């Protein structure tokens, strides 16, 4: 079986032991995994290395780095020694540029976070983020990140089609969390879509956590999502 690496499963579990056990249950159904901050102190980097070197999996390290340029550059240079595939940083242009410098010479894609899919306009107001429609703010941040050299962006599926239409998005990646299979509980996500809709809107990779991780049969859940991704409703637009 050849896994479809457009599906990235978020290993939202407490530690590397649990992460490896889940990956073994998923087997060849999943070839791409996301490791986030929650597992960093639980052996996350060691797990990333084992999944990559021993099991041939692709690795997305979701760090959302945000600091002064020199610090971000140094952090990315250090992390790039782990043979990662994707790494997230905040979408501010100075952060993106510094991350690209740190990743120089490595086959590491720097993905810029636009606005978290768990946030809506009320949340942004509470955080004193400038006024404006969330959709427009995401597009503005995506365009600025691309101009700064980002290899891709993290954005909700609701903005994916509009981001794909940006001139700056040509040849860049769109990776979307906030994916829920039809009928699934939304959890803490507020700007969501189904796997089929996300792919149809031009998304390159979807990130799915709880619908797989918390399923009674994670492998069956992953296979069901993969089936949605290849359904007739999931035909991506021609990008030529």
Curated annotation (Swiss-Prot):
Active site (UniProt)? 64 (proton donor)
Q: Which residues bind substrate?
A: 12, 34, 62-71, 117, 180, 189, 209-210
Give this protein's Gene Ontology molecular function annotations.
orotidine-5'-phosphate decarboxylase activity
- Which EC class is the enzyme in? lyase
Show the catalytic activity: orotidine 5'-phosphate + H(+) = UMP + CO2
> What's an example Gene Ontology biological process for this entry?
'de novo' UMP biosynthetic process
A Pfam short name: OMPdecase
Q: What is its EC number?
A: 4.1.1.23
Q: Which domain of life is it from?
A: Bacteria
What are the UniProt keywords, alphabetically? Decarboxylase, Lyase, Pyrimidine biosynthesis
Per the record, the pathway is: Pyrimidine metabolism; UMP biosynthesis via de novo pathway; UMP from orotate: step 2/2
Would I find Lyase among this entry's keywords?
yes
What are the TM regions of this chain, as residue ranges?
Answer: none
Report the GO terms under cellular component: cytosol
What protein family is recorded?
A: Belongs to the OMP decarboxylase family. Type 1 subfamily.
What NCBIfam families does its record include? PRK00230.1 (NF001273), pyrF (TIGR01740)
UniProt cross-references to HAMAP family, sorted A to Z? OMPdecase_type1_B
User: What is the documented function of this protein?
Assistant: Catalyzes the decarboxylation of orotidine 5'-monophosphate (OMP) to uridine 5'-monophosphate (UMP).
Subunit comment: Homodimer.
Query: What name does this protein carry?
Result: Orotidine 5'-phosphate decarboxylase
Please name the source species.
Ruegeria pomeroyi (strain ATCC 700808 / DSM 15171 / DSS-3)
UniProt lists the gene as pyrF
């Amino acid at each position: 079986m050849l896994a479809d690496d457009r599906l990235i499963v978020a290993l939202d579990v407490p530690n590397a032991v649990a992460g490896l056990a889940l990956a073994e249950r998923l087997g060849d159904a999943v070839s791409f995994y996301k490791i986030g901050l929650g597992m960093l102190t639980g052996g996350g980097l060691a797990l990333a290395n084992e999944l990559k070197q021993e099991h041939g999996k692709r690795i997305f390290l979701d760090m959302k780095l945000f600091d002064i340029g020199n610090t971000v550059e140094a952090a990315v240079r250090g992390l790039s020694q782990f043979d990662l595939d994707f790494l997230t940083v905040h979408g501010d242009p100075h952060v993106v540029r510094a991350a690209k410098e740190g990743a120089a010479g490595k086959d590491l894609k720097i993905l810029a976070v636009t606005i978290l899919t768990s946030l809506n306009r009320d949340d942004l107001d509470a955080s004193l983020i400038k006024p404006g429609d969330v959709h427009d703010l995401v597009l503005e941040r995506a365009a600025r990140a691309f101009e700064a050299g980002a290899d891709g962006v993290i954005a909700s599926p609701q903005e994916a089609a509009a981001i794909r239409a940006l001139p700056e998005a040509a040849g860049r990646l769109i990776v979307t969390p906030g994916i829920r299979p039809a009928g699934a509980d939304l959890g803490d996500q507020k700007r969501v879509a189904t796997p089929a809709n996300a792919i149809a809107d031009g998304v390159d990779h979807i990130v799915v956590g709880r619908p797989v991780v918390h399923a009674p049969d994670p492998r069956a859940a992953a296979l069901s999502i993969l089936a949605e991704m290849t359904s007739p409703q999931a035909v991506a637009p021609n990008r030529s």
